[in-house]
Structures are given as C-alpha cells and as structure tokens.
C-alpha cells in the first residue's frame, strides 16, 4: 500500500442520508473528509473514539453534550469518547475534516462507492 493517495481517487462511504466520507486509516487514527448535503442531519450518536474536526466549507450547527455552536470555515471541535453529539448543516451543506482515535472500525467495514468528484477542493 502506498503512503500517498488523492481524494478524487477514493470511493466515498455513505455514513447517513446525505453524509458521505472519504477515509484513510492509520494504526492509531482515522482521517475523514466528510461531505454533508444541504440541510442534512447527523443524528445524535456517540462512539468510543475521541474525535477532532474542522469545517472546511459551509456551515454547521454542532451540539456536543449540552453545548451548541454555529461553525463556519475554520471552526474546530473536540469530542471526548462516548459523549453524545449531533450536527445540522445549513442551506449550502458543508465539508469537514474529522480525525478519530482509535480508528473507526465501523466506518472501515462499510462498502465504498465508485470514486466521484469530491465537493472539496473545488
């Protein structure tokens, strides 16, 4: 396996309705470029992975535990393991970067679609 890849050559995985990710797994973490359609919802959920992320484009309303923030490009979040969280996108949708530790085994088990042009970079 090569140490390098290109986003446009990676098939996305469908995470929820209107939410797809292109992921790379390392030994200690997973990295994802996640595309969220306009007005989409990532329902409340939790996982055993620590999660760090940043909005690249668009806007999201992000709830982590009891705290809610409206985030645009450059907005960053930190989610400890097993803390409930959810996301709602605005009318333009969003592209975000996510890093998980340990790696997301549940995402790694999902089937990848054929590669298609990513929304970012444009």
Stretch-by-stretch model annotation:
Residues 30, 59-61, 68, 84, ...:
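Structural motif
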Residues 81-106:
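Ligand-binding loop in jelly-roll beta-barrel domains
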Residues 49-50, 54-60, 65:
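Glycine- and acidic-residue-biased ligand/ion/polar-headgroup-sensing regions
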Residues 67-81:
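Short acidic-glycine-tyrosine-enriched beta hairpin
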Residues 47-49, 75-76:
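Amphipathic, hydrophobic secondary-structure cores in small proteins
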Residues 17, 32-46:
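Conserved short histidine dyad/triad with adjacent acidic residue
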Residues 1-28, 32-33, 109-122:
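A short, N-terminal "cap"/entry segment at the start of jelly-roll beta-barrel domains
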